[in-house]
């Protein structure tokens, strides 16, 4: 029967080898609350030691999107897992939640043990950066659904926060200061446009360095999404944060309003932070308007937090002590949506 399954395109032995290879990476993510080991039907996590008055679980799920196609093209698979973790944990930390555990889903056309190991190696690195345990996952070999070189990657995370400490944004008022935390680059959104502009229409090479880039284009595009969990959790211990936004698909224009209450808008001061060269390259090669750029990409800012003006300098200092590049990038105002430089809507 095993031979028949292999003839159908599913290699059970390769799957077993992949699981064996990934165990050493998964083990590095373990927390004391994890019960059982890898390979059970379900992952278990003990919540009994959390001394919270009203514990609330916060969940998030996401994928890496077409950034995966860059990994296929470059045959580099050891960092794309960081992206999968980042997209999930950054989404729940903006509500004040500490990520507890993570599960992954890998669907592929052919289970190559070394490739699967590299993917999980990246996932494990992301989990370590976020302080959460990789307690389970699924690797599905699906011949006919994907080509032998292709795979899809998604993840799921659960975190915890005391109900009274949930960050909702509902108390944001006009005059609060917006602090931006620098991104590592494009992160994990907008890659369908990136590929069209730079690779299809622009015919740029992944091996060459262009313009002010410091790395070959392929390395620049595969930079992992920054994980903000540890600095944000440290910030929440020391200061009151009124709202946070993870700048993902939809850029500034769509994501900042998600943290703002009705009647409050955001005014952003262009020039208050450095926009990385990769965005300038995209805009130049693709002849994209500035509004499009801010409506698609993070433009150098991966996370925005709203604090009182009297706390702003201390918050910037704390974040920089945590290794982040933090800048005051704007303020909240009466109104709606996002405007730039004194009320100009892009």
From Swiss-Prot:
SUPFAM superfamilies: PurM C-terminal domain-like, PurM N-terminal domain-like. It holds the Pfam family AIRS. The keyword Cytoplasm applies. Pathway: Purine metabolism; IMP biosynthesis via de novo pathway; 5-amino-1-(5-phospho-D-ribosyl)imidazole from N(2)-formyl-N(1)-(5-phospho-D-ribosyl)glycinamide: step 2/2. It catalyses: 2-formamido-N(1)-(5-O-phospho-beta-D-ribosyl)acetamidine + ATP = 5-amino-1-(5-phospho-beta-D-ribosyl)imidazole + ADP + phosphate + H(+). CDD domains: PurM (cd02196). It comes from the Bacteria. Belongs to the AIR synthase family. This is Phosphoribosylformylglycinamidine cyclo-ligase. The gene is purM.
């Amino acid at each position: 029967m095993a031979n028949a399954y292999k003839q159908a395109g599913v290699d059970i032995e390769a799957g077993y080898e992949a699981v064996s290879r990934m165990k050493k990476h998964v083990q590095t993510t373990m927390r004391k609350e994890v019960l059982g080991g890898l390979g059970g039907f379900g992952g278990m996590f003990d919540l009994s030691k959390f001394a919270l008055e009203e514990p609330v679980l916060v969940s998030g799920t996401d994928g890496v999107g077409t950034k995966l196609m860059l990994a296929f093209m470059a045959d580099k698979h050891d960092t794309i897992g960081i992206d999968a973790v980042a997209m999930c944990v950054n989404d729940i930390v903006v509500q004040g939640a500490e990520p507890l555990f993570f599960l992954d889903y890998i669907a592929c056309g052919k289970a190559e043990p070394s490739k699967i190991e590299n993917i999980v190696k990246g996932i494990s690195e992301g989990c370590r950066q976020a302080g959460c345990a990789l307690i389970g996952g699924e690797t599905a070999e699906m011949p006919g659904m994907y080509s032998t070189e292709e795979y899809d990657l998604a993840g799921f995370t659960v975190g915890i926060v005391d109900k009274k400490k949930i960050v909702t944004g509902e108390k944001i008022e006009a005059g609060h200061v917006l602090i931006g935390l620098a991104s590592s680059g494009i992160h994990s959104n907008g890659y369908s446009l990136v590929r069209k502009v730079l690779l299809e229409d622009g015919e740029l090479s992944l091996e060459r360095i262009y313009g002010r880039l410091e790395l070959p284009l392929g390395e620049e595009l595969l930079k992992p999404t920054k994980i903000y969990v540890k600095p944000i959790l440290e910030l929440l211990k020391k200061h009151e944060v009124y709202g946070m936004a993870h700048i993902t698909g939809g850029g500034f224009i769509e994501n900042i309003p998600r943290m703002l209450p009705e009647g409050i808008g955001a005014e952003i001061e262009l020039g208050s932070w450095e926009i990385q060269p990769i965005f300038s390259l995209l805009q130049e090669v693709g002849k994209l308007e500035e509004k499009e750029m801010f409506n698609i990409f993070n433009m150098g800012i991966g996370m925005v937090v709203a604090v009182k003006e009297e706390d702003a300098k201390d918050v910037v200092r704390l974040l920089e002590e945590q290794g982040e590049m933090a800048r005051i990038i704007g303020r909240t105002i009466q109104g709606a949506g996002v405007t730039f430089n004194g009320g100009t809507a892009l």
